[in-house]
């Protein structure tokens, strides 16, 4: 039966439009006007996207299992103390799923490619907010709890998640309707402009990460003496922080494929490694939070401001709705009332 299934053809970099090109990747490209069926079939053949997809699709199910375990098996969801952790676990399910879907269906057309990654950026911004919510609830150093920064921390993180989504979407094509529309779907052509777009995208995600981790950086790198929250979670926080910086390095540098173009087209290029280390880092982050929750539960119950629906689920809901509105606006200008057919390949 499997022999009757014809897998889609793959192409080299010179055979696909420039918008589909990746630095240092020479071969393994899928048809730039693939059908949805071809995109799904490509999961089962080796292309330069195959491992990008599976390295995020499979972990999605692990985080979903973890979420369902807390909700259905342990039934801890009734305790408000657990709500921030549930929001975080939901974000851990959403961002790898959005990423794997974006990489799967991004070759249906140029327009589909942009829209897929708009959603991907929104999901990453939601994950950054999920991280802020759990840090606020479980990982702030003792001496900062109930301080001005702590009381405003989640609100600022919500704003950051919205700015992050907007800036990341802007980095692809510019301002919708003003700088691009359905008749002009292209990235800036100059090398300087392309580098600026890359820098903007990096800033869009590095800035929220750095802000989210201010309390954690202070706790594990700076703080000394009483009120610094020293426990077994600190070692794991060191580990996931190190993995996060390495993940960012891979995303920014496109190593190793830039050193040997064509040698890592299918296995071992930076985006695959970026996915792998991002997931491992997220796992260590989750583990560190669980250790903080167990070790500090009594102290946090006594000193932490009340955990409410508004500052957990409400904050996440507002961020998600805002992100979807941003994605809608950036996607809307890629369409016209009459519709625009994809250019033939």
Swiss-Prot record:
Keyword Transmembrane helix found: yes
Keyword Membrane: yes
Cytoplasmic side: 1-52, 102-114, 170-201, 294-314
Primary localization class, coarse: membrane
Keyword annotations: Developmental protein, Differentiation, Lipid-binding, Membrane, Oogenesis, Receptor, Steroid-binding, Transmembrane, Transmembrane helix
GO molecular function terms noted in the UniProt entry: signaling receptor activity; steroid binding
GO BP terms, alphabetized: oogenesis
Extracellular topological segments: 74-80, 136-148, 223-272, 336-345
InterPro entries the record matches: AdipoR/HlyIII-related
Subcellular location: Membrane
GO cellular component assignments: membrane
Cysteine pairs bridged by disulfides in the record: none
Transmembrane segments annotated in the record for this chain: 53-73, 81-101, 115-135, 149-169, 202-222, 273-293, 315-335
Job description of the protein: Steroid membrane receptor. Binds progesterone. May be involved in oocyte maturation.
Family as reported in the entry's similarity comment: Belongs to the ADIPOR family.
Protein's name according to its UniProt entry: Membrane progestin receptor gamma-A
Native source species: Danio rerio
Gene for this chain: paqr5a
């Amino acid at each position: 039966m499997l022999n009757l299934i014809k897998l889609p053809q793959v192409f080299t970099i010179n055979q696909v439009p420039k918008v589909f090109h990746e630095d240092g990747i020479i071969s393994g490209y899928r048809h730039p006007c693939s059908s949805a069926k071809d995109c799904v079939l490509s999961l089962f053949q080796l292309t330069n996207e195959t491992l990008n997809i599976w390295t995020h699709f499979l972990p999605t199910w692990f985080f979903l299992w973890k979420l369902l375990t807390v909700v259905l098996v342990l039934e801890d969801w009734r305790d408000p103390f657990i709500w921030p952790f549930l929001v975080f676990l939901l974000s851990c399910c959403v961002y790898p799923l959005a990423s794997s879907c974006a990489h799967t269906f991004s070759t249906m057309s140029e327009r589909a490619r942009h829209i897929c990654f708009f959603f991907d950026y929104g999901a990453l911004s939601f994950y950054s907010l999920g991280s802020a919510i759990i840090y606020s609830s479980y990982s702030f150093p003792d001496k900062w709890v109930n301080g001005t920064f702590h009381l405003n921390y989640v609100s600022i993180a919500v704003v950051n998640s919205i700015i992050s989504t907007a800036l990341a979407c802007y980095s692809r094509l510019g301002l919708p309707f003003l700088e691009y529309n359905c008749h002009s779907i292209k990235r800036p052509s100059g090398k300087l402009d392309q580098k600026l777009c890359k820098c903007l995208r990096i800033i869009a995600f590095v800035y929220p990460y750095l802000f989210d981790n201010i309390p954690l950086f202070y706790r594990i790198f700076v703080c000394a003496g009483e009120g610094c929250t020293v426990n077994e979670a600190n070692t794991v926080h060191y580990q996931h922080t190190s993995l996060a910086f390495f993940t960012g390095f891979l995303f920014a540098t496109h190593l190793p494929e830039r050193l040997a173009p064509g040698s890592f087209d299918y296995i071992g290029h930076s985006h695959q490694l970026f996915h792998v280390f991002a997931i491992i880092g997220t796992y260590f982050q989750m583990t560190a939070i669980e250790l903080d929750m167990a070790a500090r539960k009594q102290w946090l119950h006594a000193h932490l401001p009340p955990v409410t629906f508004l500052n957990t689920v409400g904050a996440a809901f507002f961020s998600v709705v805002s992100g979807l509105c941003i994605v809608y606006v950036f996607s809307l200008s890629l369409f016209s009332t009459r519709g625009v057919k994809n250019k033939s390949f």
